[in-house]
Amino acid sequence: MPRKPRQLPAQNTLPYLLLTLTALCGEYPIRQISHLPGGSAYLESVVTALRRDGLLRTFSKDGLRGLRLTSSAKRLLLADAPEWFSAYLTGSSEPNKLKSEIPRRLRLHRMAEILTIMHNADIPAFPWEKAPFSAASQSAAIPAYYTSREVKEIGPQGAKIKSSRATGILLTDGGIFLTYNTAKAQMKWEYKAELRFKALLQTEGVMPDAEISGIVFGSTMEQLSILTQPDAHSYFLLDGSFPHFYYLTNDRYGEAILRLLCDTQQRRTLDAILADGLHEGIPNWRVENDAIDSEGNPVLFAYTCDFPRIQRFDTALELHGMTGTLICFDYQEEALREICGQCVMLQSIDFQQFERSVLYS
């Protein structure tokens, strides 16, 4: 039987982090625990201890399992940091008034997954770690991630994006990224709502000169082929509304790409390594490219998995009867082979070597 909790774990510990993520989202997916920092045995012991101490409980229904705060945990968190948690653990806020319907719970799980990967990538994502969204244009602190809930708090304008499937937006030195999470399922996109979200960012003056792109997270690389199929609901992914849309997996691979998208200088470093032995790219050529090989064929650096750009490269090669090389990470190669035609040759980078020599060097 769980104890009656008397105190919280210390801040800046993994147990407190898990309680924080659960408080902000309402329900934390069991399957996501393995993505938190730490070994599997330690993570299991943390969850067991929080349950035993009466701070977390398991909620399971319709095959979907998650962790929820107990009433005692809410009380202790509010006493510990009211300025952090009052907006989430009081009144009629969704994390405080949880529902059991599968669509609502899945949305909470998707939000939790994105908050976790942002935290793992050292991107400020908790409300108290950054300026309010209404003041984001005056803040120099980037990168920063804002949940869709934070964006909607700007006032009446926020109602225009009510139907959007975006989990939030990521502000970086390279631009703004509307962020989505399809998880294991095929997402039903809301075309008009997503374009309204983009228009809202353009009119609200958040980084007014920044390019607006998209990131969609999924569970595996195999889901990429589904996203690139011509479908009425996902048409905006490839119709040019967003010239750049990146597919990232919800794991350490996706975390690494996320770090690259937030760090222009590190991308330049990797590009310079990949360009060694190649000729300089040709701007505004008939085939989009980052470099030219010794035979005069275009080369595209595709390690960020910008799938509209990859599709444009593939289509242009076929249209002009040319061949070209697409450079990606080894874990992306099989999925990219599936969506590219015979004109594209794939060349892969060893991801583990990249981690050791570039990402964390």
Regions found by a protein language model. Give the residues of each.
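Short, Lys/Arg-enriched N-terminal segment that forms or immediately precedes the first helix
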Residues: 1-7
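Short, cationic-aromatic polyanion-contact patches
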Residues: 10-12, 29, 61-82
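Short acidic, hydrophobic short linear motifs in intrinsically disordered regions
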Residues: 25-36
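Short amphipathic alpha-helical interaction segments
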Residues: 36-53
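A short, conserved structural fragment
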Residues: 51-62
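Short, amphipathic alpha-helical interaction segments positioned at domain boundaries
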Residues: 72-105
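Exposed, interaction-prone assembly regions rather than primary DNA-binding/catalytic cores
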Residues: 95-190
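Long, compositionally biased intrinsically disordered regions
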Residues: 179-187, 199-361
